């Protein structure tokens, strides 16, 4: 939970914007491969993505993508899963707001870890 303590407004806002830019640059790089290639076959595509630099770059981008999603989901949880907002929906949810928010954080944390593990396994298989 140290991550939640370190997440301050301007810092996470900037990190999410910079991560979006890096993801965009990666997508432009991959799309430029398609544009520059005269003929794309499975072998050309696999040679491109199985090269060490593309595996490394793709791994880094997926870690950045996961971090980007984590910031977005954390923001949703802290903004909308509070006693005030849940109490607006139903008064009985007020006493469960902290539990609901923590379960939400746990769920997307576990899903993110599983996602990252599977992606890295697939990339480096």
What are these regions (language model features)?
Residues 2-125:
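Membrane-embedded alpha-helical bundles that constitute the cytochrome b-like, heme-associated redox core
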């Amino acid at each position: 939970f140290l991550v939640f303590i370190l997440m301050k407004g301007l810092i996470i806002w900037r990190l999410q914007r910079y991560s979006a830019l890096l993801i965009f640059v990666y997508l432009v790089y991959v799309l430029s491969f398609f544009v520059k290639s005269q003929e794309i076959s499975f072998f050309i595509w696999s040679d491109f993505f199985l090269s060490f630099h593309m595996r490394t770059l793709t791994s880094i981008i997926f870690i950045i993508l996961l971090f980007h999603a984590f910031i977005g989901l954390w923001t949703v949880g802290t903004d909308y899963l509070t006693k005030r907002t849940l109490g607006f929906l139903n008064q009985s949810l007020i006493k469960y707001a902290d539990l609901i928010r923590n379960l939400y954080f746990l769920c997307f944390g576990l899903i993110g870890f599983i996602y990252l593990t599977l992606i890295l396994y697939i990339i480096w298989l």
